[in-house]
């Protein structure tokens, strides 16, 4: 099983989520939309929170703090099962997007497109509110 970590980067005090802009799709998945939650694979021996910090640093150039696992989803992609762990946290710093991310957008839930990679906007709203409840 492949374990993917999708990160829900919360911009503290703004009610906004930072989404990655990936022109031409991500891993060849252009049909899944232009905006994605930053994501990557869980490395051998790595904890999900550590992976989330690494992914946000490597893809957006930002720090991620207060990480919490807020959701999971299993899906069959091609010939392999993927387990997606959604880890939320607060971002800080100046963004510096790196490949495969071509840009980013800080958006409120109402401003998000319907589809964020493998996640629908309604899923992201539930996960975001779960993060807020867990951090309270």
Regions found by a protein language model. Name each.
Residues 69-74, 106:
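Hydrophobic/anchoring residues in structured secondary elements
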Residues 1-35, 64, 89:
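N-terminal strand-loop-strand
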Residues 11, 86-90, 105-108:
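Short, well-ordered beta-strand micro-motif
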Residues 32-33, 96-136:
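Nudix hydrolase/Nudix homology domain
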Residues 37-71, 87:
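The catalytic Nudix box helix
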Residues 1, 31, 77-83, 98-101:
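A generic structural micro-feature
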Residues 73-95, 123, 130:
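Active-site-adjacent beta-strand/loop module that shapes the phosphate/pyrophosphate-binding cleft
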């Amino acid at each position: 099983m492949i374990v993917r970590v999708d990160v829900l980067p919360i911009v503290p005090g703004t009610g906004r989520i930072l989404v990655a802009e990936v022109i031409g799709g991500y891993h060849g998945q252009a049909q899944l939309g232009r905006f994605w939650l930053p994501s990557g694979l869980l490395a051998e021996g790595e904890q999900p929170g550590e992976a989330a910090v690494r992914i946000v640093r490597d893809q957006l150039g930002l720090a991620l703090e207060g990480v919490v696992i807020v959701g999971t989803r299993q899906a069959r992609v091609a010939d392999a099962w993927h387990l997606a762990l959604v880890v939320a946290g607060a971002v800080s710093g100046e963004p510096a997007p790196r490949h495969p991310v071509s840009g980013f957008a800080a958006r409120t839930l109402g401003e998000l497109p319907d589809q964020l990679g493998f996640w629908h906007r309604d899923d992201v709203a539930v996960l975001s509110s779960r993060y807020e409840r867990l951090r309270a």
